[in-house]
């Protein structure tokens, strides 16, 4: 029998597969089989949106075509029969034409590293196919499933808003106030200079959107769907069989034959279990276009929805119904809609089915508690006939008598209409407001006797608080017949707490927070129902106390918008001179079309191998044995490399590559498996058997390291003035400490490399995503015992780095190169997201202890500080992080008597490393926490204490470097003015007085960010410029393009210096072959240093060619180049910059480590929900001193992207470790970086007028890192809001808020009767699920 063919279309091209592997996902099929590499791998679990494509399906019954976005990483190709797939390549390209969304996202500066851009483009494209003029709500909803680590989202929204109606407006007009009016939050801006600069792009130049020019749905697929009789398709793979029934009868027969086989529609539940949990299903049943599974019908008893409907379709259906029917009939539907709007991203909602969501019964399911309290029923079918069962707590607990039978199929769900005097509410709390699994969720329903007030039925279910969804049915039963009033509230809360219990060591942790949410939700339910009763019967229903009403309102929610005040080019500047102009990232269009090539986009090399790692499952253990036999016996496995193979090459400097006798962290590299495919390598890695013997001590936290004196090297120390004497003369002394959690880099492109032996003289080429090609060259040369001139490292671009692609990348590259050299074959190594997060480490967790002596007016005269960073198991950059922390801890303040000491702690965690800001975001937060506490003690605002202690005019730092603080004062004054500080502070006070359960807070933070490497040698740079005879130029330099736009700026430099159009200048990438002996790209100086080298090369060429140019001033570069060639004058030049003068003597505690300082200030206003811990950033103003901006568009992108990354660090990004040292948060489903829902509603960025700095490139300043710290303005604004909540509740005295300020910490700091009501567990009496490190 001939195998059944799989037929679908990709970008209008027919695809026919005869031998389909059911385990093949669409993403690898597109990338490897079809070589469409524009669709990116970001996480593999549907959490980041990098792999978004559009699927189009034709329904022959309705004659309609449905377009929707999906995650290609979770889409089996077997599910695509009869569909049309559109990828980013299908929209347009640079060779033919661009689609308007591709053009606009690039020209609106919505790309930086560009790795997320194709996914963003496809999400927006799918929206435009359905809604050519979308609303802003539709826009933000469409992009809710896409993550970006670089831009801060705002320019992406700007690009997409150009498709909306009235795209120039924020669409948030309220009380007559709009973003286009120069009034903000009702407070008029009074200053003349607050008028914003012209936009960084011109909408008038954009291509129009013409829906008639889109790809048509393939007519062949329409004909097949309408004319060919449907029949079950079966695809057989090596391990898995895929069955696609096309009628309900065939589906029932398949389920009868294979009762244990899962029925999948979107693969969003089964897929992650298969990929991440190792679940195996030999048979998969996937229904295709079965009409009964898509039924939508209304009857007297309610609404019936087919189990095969996607969650997005359910959302649209319910939204339509609630608009048409009275509220009393649609209580359950409104509650479901509330959760559907935040559940996952658009891609997952379009893939996941209603039936799959119900049957999977995840403990944190958002819909199941609501469906259960709404008395929904499930319509089942099997060979034995139809059956109807309630969607009850017993069903959700999988009780056999209430569950589906293995051979039964869920056909549809009946959702009853609600009745008069019936109220249904939905609650959830997550780490992030959208596209995040709930920490706790709940569905609650109450029915009153006629007339209201007395409970007739009550149902309360919770998710996230147990191994299954839990019902408080006993509590509900005891409350039936009782009146609904506030007097009973405490009784209800205690009853529920007694019934819905959580063990102190419960999975997921956050136990006290979850207990508090259980009763906080119950309180909100009481308020919502009371409000509903009052609407029904104003005279006889309980009235809400005025201070309770705020608990019912959502947090501040408007559409995001921004204003920019950037530097404008001097009118006298030549029009062709690009310096200072907002020029688009020169790879922006290629990012948007998918044509930009990243490391793993490179075509496979002949006989290429794939390498993957086996990592330790223990944090500190002796390796007793390693059994490789079973793994080596698997087909396709070529070799397994251990430390024994590397021998003395297993170390380089302080780093060891593969474990020898011991492992020192979970994620320690044990061995490397090499096979002929990625799949086979990963299968073999699972078969490597390692036996461990645990060792003591196990040190995970900073406190444990201090206890065991486990430090790298000795302390670092700086001191100025006489601290001990100053403490004797101050009015007050306080001591405190703050813990700052670590942060994952979460670059969108994971660690990637391809090593290709050249087959001659031992030469080897390394194509790698790194910030430091020279270091990889050195480490590989040492490993292979080659001279460096035979090892060439090439980097075209990097899909995000932030400091995370230096040390560990080099180790991975050395091992991969060893494998390639040993076997004489190319070897590719691409880490999966979970592997990357487990192995690589991130920002150092930090502990700051401070003792401050100050006068009553707030002036700090003495400060004694101790800093500790959690370095992990190897030194890496930990000592440098401590050094930078100590040098920069003063931030914007003059402390006349300061002693600071720091230690890098050795622990059994993966080695932590550099991350944007490099110690300053942690050290600065310690200082600002101290300032804030001093303010509280003095009864002053933190802004007053900051002003009193701020550097003024020309001053010296605690390490005796002189600088001028004039720009710092300007930034502070301008920020205070632009944010209307005093007016808004008063408005916040009024808001807080009127709202008991919502509070607002505001904070203004100054910034003095030193820029420099600390060493002349580490600051040197080189460049190479060629001029060709056609008048074009090629430039090479040592900097790495990782999203910051350094290549664009270098071409701007060449254009200015050679007076050559930018279109005539090209830059291919970075290579140790063209520019040797480069330094790492980082520290905000990449454009500074390399730009000065490029400038030097250009000036050398100009000087050399000056006689020729002067003789023919009207000539072109083609003329001048030809003349030079004819005269045997070289048209190539090397440029060099030796580095800024930089030094620091740690023995003397003085030096000049930094070339200059970036100054700035940020004001943020937030709103918090005291019951749940949610927060919303309402508005942020940022003022920066940038010198002379080389490219305002790129510089604003750096400031804004860094701010959002810093905001994530200080609020929602939380690493979670087990007490045994295992990292739990290994992907976007567990680790939450900011998404579109998290950005400030208003963002106002201003640059000071240009200022001169003679030593830097065109008086510019590096802005890559400084903005991260300004994110702490959100942290301290939340602190201010929490303080207001505590003061209202009469809670005095100090309290400690550590970073990140997650919903858990916010909620638990807002102490109230509910936090006092929950049971508390004695520390030390239990083993927690997770620990802070």
Curated annotation (Swiss-Prot):
Binding site for Mo-molybdopterin: 112, 150, 801-802, 1042, 1083-1086, 1198, 1263
UniProt cross-references to Gene3D superfamilies, sorted A to Z: 3.10.20.30, 3.30.465.10, [2Fe-2S]-binding domain, Aldehyde oxidase/xanthine dehydrogenase, a/b hammerhead, Aldehyde oxidase/xanthine dehydrogenase, molybdopterin binding domain, CO dehydrogenase flavoprotein, C-terminal domain, Uridine Diphospho-n-acetylenolpyruvylglucosamine Reductase, domain 2
Note: AOX genes evolved from a xanthine oxidoreductase ancestral precursor via a series of gene duplication and suppression/deletion events. Different animal species contain a different complement of AOX genes encoding an equivalent number of AOX isoenzymes. In mammals, the two extremes are represented by certain rodents such as mice and rats, which are endowed with 4 AOX genes, and by humans, whose genome is characterized by a single active gene.
List of catalytic residues: 1265 (proton acceptor)
Predominant cellular place of this UniProt entry's protein: cytoplasm
EC number: 1.2.3.1, 1.17.3.-
Induction (free text): Repressed by pioglitazone, fenofibrate and PPARA agonists. Induced by testosterone.
Documented effect of changing residue 1169 to D: In strain: C57BL/6 X CBA and 129/Sv
Effect noted on mutating residue 168 to G: In strain: C57BL/6 X CBA and 129/Sv
Species this protein is from: Mus musculus (Mouse)
A GO BP annotation: lipid metabolic process
UniProt-recorded Gene Ontology molecular function terms: 2 iron, 2 sulfur cluster binding; aldehyde oxidase activity; FAD binding; flavin adenine dinucleotide binding; iron ion binding; molybdopterin cofactor binding; NAD binding; protein homodimerization activity
Gene Ontology CC terms, in alphabetical order: cytosol
Kinase keyword on record: no
Positions bearing Phosphoserine: 1063
Record domain 2Fe-2S ferredoxin-type: where: 4-91
Pfam families assigned: Ald_Xan_dh_C, CO_deh_flav_C, FAD_binding_5, Fer2, Fer2_2, MoCoBD_1, MoCoBD_2
List of residues binding [2Fe-2S] cluster 2: 113, 116, 148, 150
Function: Oxidase with broad substrate specificity, oxidizing aromatic azaheterocycles, such as N1-methylnicotinamide, N-methylphthalazinium and phthalazine, as well as aldehydes, such as benzaldehyde, retinal, pyridoxal, and vanillin. Plays a role in the metabolism of xenobiotics and drugs containing aromatic azaheterocyclic substituents. Participates in the bioactivation of prodrugs such as famciclovir, catalyzing the oxidation step from 6-deoxypenciclovir to penciclovir, which is a potent antiviral agent.
The protein's name: Aldehyde oxidase 1
Cofactor note as given: Binds 2 [2Fe-2S] clusters per subunit.
């Amino acid at each position: 029998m001939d195998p059944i063919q799989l037929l679908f279309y990709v970008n209008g091209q027919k695809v026919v597969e005869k031998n389909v592997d059911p385990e093949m996902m669409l993403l690898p099929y597109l990338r490897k089989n079809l070589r469409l590499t524009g669709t990116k791998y970001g996480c593999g679990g549907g959490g980041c949106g990098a792999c978004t494509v559009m699927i189009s399906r034709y329904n022959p019954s309705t004659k309609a075509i449905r377009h929707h976005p999906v995650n290609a990483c979770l889409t089996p190709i077997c599910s695509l029969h009869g569909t049309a797939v559109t990828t980013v390549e299908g929209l347009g390209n640079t060779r033919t034409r661009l689609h308007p969304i591709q053009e606009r996202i690039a020209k609106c500066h919505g790309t930086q590293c560009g790795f997320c851009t194709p996914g963003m483009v496809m999400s927006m494209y799918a929206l435009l196919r359905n809604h050519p003029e979308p609303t802003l709500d539709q826009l933000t909803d469409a992009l809710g499933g896409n993550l970006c680590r670089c831009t801060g989202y705002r320019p992406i929204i700007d690009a997409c808003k150009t498709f909306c109606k009235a795209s120039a407006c924020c669409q948030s007009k309220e009380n007559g106030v709009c973003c286009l009016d120069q009034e903000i939050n009702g407070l008029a801006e009074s200053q003349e200079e607050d008028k914003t600069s012209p936009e960084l792009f011109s909408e008038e130049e954009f291509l129009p959107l013409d829906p008639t020019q889109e790809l048509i749905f393939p007519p062949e697929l329409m004909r097949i769907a309408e004319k060919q009789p449907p029949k079950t398709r079966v695809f057989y793979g090596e391990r898995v069989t895929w069955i696609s029934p096309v009628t309900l009868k065939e589906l029932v027969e398949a389920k009868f034959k294979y009762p244990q086989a899962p029925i999948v529609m979107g693969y969003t539940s089964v897929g992650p279990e298969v990929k991440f949990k190792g679940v195996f299903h030999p048979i998969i049943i996937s229904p295709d276009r079965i009409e009964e599974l898509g039924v939508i019908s209304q009857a007297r008893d309610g609404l019936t929805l087919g189990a095969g409907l996607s969650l997005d379709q359910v959302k649209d259906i319910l939204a339509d119904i609630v608009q048409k029917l009275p509220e009393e009939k649609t209580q359950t539907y409104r509650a479901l809609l509330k959760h559907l709007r935040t559940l996952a991203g658009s891609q997952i909602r379009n893939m996941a089915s209603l039936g799959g969501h119900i049957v999977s019964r995840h403990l944190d399911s958002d819909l199941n508690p609501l469906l259960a309290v709404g008395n929904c029923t499930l319509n089942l079918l099997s060979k034995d006939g139809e059956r109807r069962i309630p969607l009850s707590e017993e069903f959700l607990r999988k009780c056999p008598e209430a569950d589906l039978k293995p051979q039964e199929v869920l056909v549809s769900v009946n959702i009853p209409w609600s009745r008069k005097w019936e109220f249904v509410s939905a609650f959830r709390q997550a780490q992030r407001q959208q596209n995040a699994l709930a920490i706790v969720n709940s569905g609650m329903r109450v029915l009153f006797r006629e007339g209201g007030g007395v409970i007739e039925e009550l149902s309360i279910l919770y998710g996230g608080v147990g191994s299954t969804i839990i019902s408080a049915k006993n509590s509900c039963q005891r409350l039936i017949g009782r009146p609904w009033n506030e007097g009973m509230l405490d009784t209800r809360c205690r009853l529920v707490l007694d019934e819905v219990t959580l063990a102190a060591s419960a999975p997921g942790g956050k136990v006290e927070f979850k207990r508090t949410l259980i009763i906080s939700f119950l309180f909100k339910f009481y308020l919502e129902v009371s409000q509903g009763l009052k609407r029904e019967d104003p005279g006889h229903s309980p009235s809400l106390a005025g201070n309770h009403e705020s608990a019912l309102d959502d947090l501040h929610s408007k559409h995001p918008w921004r204003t920019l005040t950037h530097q404008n080019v001097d009118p006298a500047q030549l029009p062709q001179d690009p310096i200072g102009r907002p020029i688009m990232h020169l790879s922006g269009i290629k990012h948007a079309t998918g044509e930009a090539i990243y490391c793993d986009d490179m075509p496979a090399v002949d006989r290429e191998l794939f390498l993957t790692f086996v990592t330790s499952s223990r944090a500190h253990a002796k390796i007793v044995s390693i059994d490789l036999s079973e793994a080596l016996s698997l087909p396709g496995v070529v070799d397994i490399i251990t430390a024994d193979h590397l021998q003395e090459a297993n170390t380089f400097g302080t780093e060891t590559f593969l474990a020898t006798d011991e492992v020192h962290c979970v994620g320690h590299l044990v061995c490397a498996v090499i096979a002929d495919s990625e799949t086979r390598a990963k299968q073999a890695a699972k078969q490597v058997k390692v036996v461990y013997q645990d060792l003591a001590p196990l040190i995970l936290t900073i406190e444990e390291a201090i206890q065991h004196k486990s430090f790298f090297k000795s302390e670092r120390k700086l001191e100025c003035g006489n601290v001990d004497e100053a403490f004797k003369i101050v009015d007050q002394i306080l001591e405190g400490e703050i813990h700052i959690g670590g942060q994952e880099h979460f670059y969108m492109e994971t660690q990637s490399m391809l090593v290709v032996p050249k087959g001659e003289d031992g030469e080897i080429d390394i194509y790698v995503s790194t910030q430091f090609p020279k270091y990889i060259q050195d480490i590989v040369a040492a490993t292979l015992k080659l001279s460096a001139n035979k090892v060439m490292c090439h980097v075209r671009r990097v899909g995000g780095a932030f400091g995370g692609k230096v040390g560990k990348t080099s180790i991975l590259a050395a091992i991969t190169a060893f494998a390639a050299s040993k076997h004489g074959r190319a070897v590719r190594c691409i880490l999966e997201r979970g592997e990357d997060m487990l192995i690589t480490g991130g920002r150092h967790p930090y502990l700051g202890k401070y003792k401050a002596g100050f006068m009553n007016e707030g002036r700090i005269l003495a400060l004694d500080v101790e800093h500790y960073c959690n370095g992990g198991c190897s030194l890496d950059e930990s000592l440098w992080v401590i050094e930078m922390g100590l040098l920069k801890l003063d931030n914007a303040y003059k402390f006349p008597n300061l002693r600071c000491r720091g230690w890098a702690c050795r622990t059994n965690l993966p080695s932590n490393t550099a991350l944007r800001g490099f110690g300053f975001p942690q050290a600065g937060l310690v200082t600002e926490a101290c300032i804030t506490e001093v303010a509280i003690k003095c009864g002053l605002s933190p802004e007053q204490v900051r002003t009193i202690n701020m550097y003024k005019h020309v001053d010296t730092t605690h390490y005796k470097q002189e600088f001028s603080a004039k720009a710092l004062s300007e930034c502070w004054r301008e920020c205070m003015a632009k944010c209307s500080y005093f007016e808004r502070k008063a408005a916040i006070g009024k808001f807080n007085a009127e709202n008991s359960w919502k509070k607002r807070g505001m904070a203004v933070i100054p910034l003095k960010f030193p820029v420099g490497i600390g060493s002349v040698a580490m600051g040197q740079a080189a460049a190479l410029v060629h001029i060709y005879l056609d008048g074009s130029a090629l430039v090479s330099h040592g900097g790495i393009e990782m999203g910051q736009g350094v290549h664009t700026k270098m071409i701007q430099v060449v254009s200015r210096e050679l007076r050559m159009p930018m279109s005539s200048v090209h830059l291919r990438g970075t290579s140790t072959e063209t520019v040797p002996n480069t330094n790492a790209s980082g520290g905000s100086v990449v454009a500074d240093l390399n730009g000065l080298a490029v400038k030097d090369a250009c000036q050398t060429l100009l000087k050399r060619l000056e006689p020729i140019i002067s003789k023919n001033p009207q000539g072109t570069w083609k003329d001048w180049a030809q003349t030079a060639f004819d005269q045997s004058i070289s048209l190539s030049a090397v440029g060099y910059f030796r580095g800024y003068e930089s030094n620091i003597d740690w023995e003397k505690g003085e030096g000049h480590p930094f070339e200059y300082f970036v100054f700035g200030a940020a004001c943020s206003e937030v709103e918090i929900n005291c019951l749940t811990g949610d927060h919303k950033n309402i508005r942020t103003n940022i003022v920066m001193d940038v010198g002379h901006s080389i490219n305002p568009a790129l510089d604003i992108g750096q400031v804004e992207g860094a701010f959002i990354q810093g905001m994530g660090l200080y609020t929602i990004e939380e690493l979670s470790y087990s007490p045994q040292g295992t990292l739990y948060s290994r992907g976007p489903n567990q680790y939450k970086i900011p998404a579109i829902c998290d950005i400030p509603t208003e963002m106002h960025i201003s640059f000071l007028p240009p200022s001169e700095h003679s030593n830097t490139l065109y008086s510019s300043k590096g802005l890559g890192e400084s903005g991260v710290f300004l994110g702490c303005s959100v942290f301290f604004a939340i602190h201010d809001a929490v303080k207001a909540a505590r003061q209202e509740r009469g809670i005095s005295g100090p309290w400690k808020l550590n970073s990140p300020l997650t919903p858990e910490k916010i909620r638990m700091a807002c102490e109230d009767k509910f936090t006092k009501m929950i049971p508390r567990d004695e520390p030390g009496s239990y083993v927690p699920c997770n620990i802070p490190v």
